[in-house]
Every structure is written in structure tokens, then in C-alpha cells.
Amino acid sequence: MRDVEGVQFLQWCLPRLQLRWSGYRKVRRQVYKRISARLQLLGLHSVADYRSYLETHPEEWEVLDSSCWIPISRFYRDKGVFQFLEQEVLPSLARQALAQGKSVLRCWSIGCAAGEEPYSLSLLWKLKIQAQFPTIRLVILATDIDDQAIARAQQGCYPPSSLKDLPESWRTQAFDHTAEGFRIKQEYQEPVTLLVQDIRRTVPEETFHLILCRYLAFTYFDAALQSNTLRQLVERMQIGGALVIGNGETLPEGEFGLIPWSEKEGIYRRA
């Protein structure tokens, strides 16, 4: 697929999926590969043929939508974010929970890919923070639209490149080095519940002290869908809870009841 054809096709189809072209500039070639594979499977010869196919087969939009999700993740991605979570956010939330007589901190990792983000959070809590708050238990819900990504997260086995940002001592302590790669130990998997879920259609019923929504809604969704998603996230946050977005992402304009905790790290607090 030539780039000019791919760009024109994405600029046509993405708005119909409530996605925005600007979020796909850097990852568009990965989407091209998926679309090209789909064309071959359908016996189509060009993106023009595929566009015609979409117009006569509305069920194909679901397939195209799934082709537009590009998981890019690794452990401890954006080191400064996890340092701020360690030094400020999680201790503050733990103290808040203690003051309310609670024994559980609830976290939600959205677009968790193969589990790198929620497991990083589990490592951070168990290796750096838990000793300060021995009566507090961290539980993490990790969701992703991709059932194959969730299956990989359940296996918990990763190539060395996924762990390159982790402190060396954490790799030694929390992973078994196997022939397949680095397998995270069960005690660090235990706090994490993995679930296939599309945030555009379903959100959990419970509320959370910490929500991480990085490099998903505020990169790929269009303005209206971003605003709707943010309203739902705020509704699912505890008062005083924290929302973490991706490096370089911005929240949509409007009154959502959030105040900056660290704008540099993309962390906000529900007022």
C-alpha cells in the first residue's frame, strides 16, 4: 500500500470510527500492514476496493476498528510518571484510604496491552511502597480491547526489550528468566485482574483511587469521544483520586472537576 493511498483511506475512515488522523501519523504504517493483510484475506486488490466493500458490508467496520488499535507498551514506561506515583500519588492515596478506614486501594489500567503497565504498578507497590502501608492492599483492574493482548498478559512472559526501563534489582527480584523470556512471578501477578473491555462501550461499576489512561483516549479518540470518555472516567474516580494520561497528551477543554497534580507527568486529581 502506497503511503498516499493509506493516508487518504485513514483520513476517510477514522472519523467514522470516532478516531482522529493526527493520532495515527506515527503508527500509520502498522495499520497499513493490518489492512493489507485484510485485503488479501478478502481477495481485494486496493484500498478503493476495500472502501467499496465497507460501504456494502457494514459489519466489516468492526474488523477495521480492531485493526486500528496499535499496542505499544513496556514496563515502567515514562520513568518520571512512576517516580511521581511512588513519591507522591500512591502514598497520598494510601493515607487517604487509611483516614477513611479503608484497607484497599483500587486502580484501573486502561488499554493495558500485554500487562506491562498494571504489572509495573504492582511491582512499584510491592517493592517500594507496601512496607509503609502494611494494612493497605492494592488491587488493579487491567482492561484492553484486544483479547490476544490480554492472553499474553495472562501468560506474563516478556522479551528483554520490554523490561529495559525497569531497575535491574526489580528484574532479578520479580522475574524468572526462562527459555521463552522473562516471566513475572505469581505474587506480582496476583493483584491484577485482566479483562477484555472496550472503554467506548463499557466501564466498570466500581470506583477507583487511581486510573491510568495513557496513549489511548487522548491520542486516538476524536474530540467528542474524548470528552465523553473523560466524563465517564471522572465518574469512576474517588473524590481525591488520581488520573494519569500519557506524556504529551492533553485533556479536552471543559469543566470536568480535575485539578493538576503534576502537569509535567500528566497527572490530575479529582477535586
Q: What does each of the following model-derived ranges do?
A:
Residues 2-108:
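Conserved AdoMet
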Residues 102-120, 141:
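Conserved class I S-adenosyl-L-methionine
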Residues 114-133:
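Conserved SAM-binding loop of SAM-dependent methyltransferases across substrates and taxa
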Residues 226-239:
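A short glycine-rich, Lys/Arg-flanked "PGG" loop and its adjoining helix->strand segment in the class I
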Residues 239-247:
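Conserved beta-strand signature within the Rossmann-like core of class I S-adenosyl-L-methionine
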Residues 252-271:
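Core SAM-dependent methyltransferase catalytic element
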